Amino acid sequence: MNVITMLEREQMRGDIPDFRPGDTVRVHIRIIEGQKQRIQAFEGIVIRKKGGLSQASFTVRKISYGIGVEKTFPIHSPSIDRIDVVTRGRVRRARLYYLRGLQGKKARIKELRKV
């Protein structure tokens, strides 16, 4: 194993839950404004998960006041306080870009049921 890979493994976080595209997640982000620090939640559907060791990222999409908002987060970012999986979705694609063109009830994702 080379030196760069070893350094990347040290920087990685171990408290990340297992989630996939189609899942609804709540990402708690640590925001620093001047001397103050607060935590803001961003809840939406995971439309993409990009691999890699320390460069892994995921994109979350939500509808805010009728406008679609997408944010891409690095998985191992120190500014992410925690990630909560709200619901598991059942999809057959790895990239859910088709949700961008859908509105209302057509943009719903089936919930994965445990049997």
Curated annotation (Swiss-Prot):
Keywords, sorted A to Z: Ribonucleoprotein, Ribosomal protein
InterPro entries, alphabetized: Ribosomal_bL19 (IPR001857), Ribosomal_bL19_CS (IPR018257), Ribosomal_bL19_sf (IPR038657), Translation_prot_SH3-like_sf (IPR008991)
Disulfide bonds: none
A Gene Ontology term for the protein's cellular component: cytosolic large ribosomal subunit
Superkingdom of the source species: Bacteria
One GO term of the biological process aspect: translation
A Pfam family: Ribosomal_L19
Keyword Mitochondrion among record annotations: no
Role of this protein: This protein is located at the 30S-50S ribosomal subunit interface and may play a role in the structure and function of the aminoacyl-tRNA binding site.
Family indicated by similarity: Belongs to the bacterial ribosomal protein bL19 family.
Protein name: Large ribosomal subunit protein bL19
Gene: rplS
